[in-house]
Curated annotation (Swiss-Prot):
InterPro entries: Rbsml_eL15_core_dom_sf, Ribosomal_eL15, Ribosomal_eL15_CS, Ribosomal_uL23/eL15/eS24_sf. Keywords: Cytoplasm, Nucleus, Phosphoprotein, Ribonucleoprotein, Ribosomal protein. The gene is rpl1502. Pfam families: Ribosomal_L15e. PROSITE patterns: RIBOSOMAL_L15E (PS01194). GO terms for molecular function: RNA binding; structural constituent of ribosome. There are 2 genes for eL15 in S.pombe. Its main location: cytoplasm. This is Large ribosomal subunit protein eL15B. It comes from Schizosaccharomyces pombe (strain 972 / ATCC 24843) (Fission yeast).
């Protein structure tokens, strides 16, 4: 069993003494830093690698904190100018997750980079902390790598703002619901009985 497996098991048990101590110390450390700052390396390397991160040139990790809680409707003096049923201001729930917000803010901050994915790292009473994996589309190491150079294509600019990242698709409900529950029997049979020699193994 490799080292990443141990890290994964450690991360699962949030109430363990090690994790509680680490999260408390790290939350304090992250609060002292800027809202968006570059991390020298991922604080969860196993998770980052599963989501596509590689420790090589062209890949960057940014850490961000997002305030917890609902979203207040941005109306002046609480005047919504509508029927009473639509006059709510305070107890409204934002339909996208905090991780979506984190990706969007980092994407705007680093507008020359492309957002690949993100993951949760910590939270306290006020904030949630996320790390966002970004890729430099103009770096030669990225442009020459056939596994990641799809992101160089201009259609992938600001994919986080259009709900095309993993969490963005989840917020849009893609891959969920009655259409996805029962996969066709023929497709399953074909998948299990087809020899597929992939380029990367």
């Amino acid at each position: 069993m490799g080292a990443y497996k141990y890290l994964e098991e450690l991360a699962k048990k949030k109430q363990s003494d090690v994790n509680l101590f680490l999260s408390r110390v790290r939350a304090w450390e992250y609060r002292q830093m800027n809202v968006i700052h570059r991390a020298s390396r991922p604080s969860r390397p196993d998770k980052a690698r599963r989501l596509g991160y590689k420790a090589k040139q062209g890949y960057v990790i940014y850490r961000i904190r997002v305030r917890r809680g609902g979203r207040k409707r941005p109306v002046p003096k609480g005047q919504t100018y509508g029927k009473p049923v639509h006059q709510g201001v305070n107890h409204l729930k934002y339909q996208r997750s905090a991780r979506c917000t984190a990706e969007e803010r980092v994407g705007r901050y680093c507008s020359n980079l492309r957002v690949l994915n993100s993951y949760w790292v910590n939270q306290d009473a006020t904030y949630k902390f996320f790390e966002v994996i970004l890729v430099d589309p103009s770096h030669k190491a990225i442009r020459r790598d056939p596994r990641i150079n799809w992101i160089v294509n201009p259609v992938h600019k600001h994919r986080e703002s259009r709900g095309l990242t993993s969490i963005g698709k989840k917020s849009r409900g893609i891959g969920k619901g009655h259409r996805y529950n029962n996969s066709p029997q023929h497709a399953t049979w074909l998948r299990h009985n087809t020899l597929s020699l992939r380029r990367y193994r």
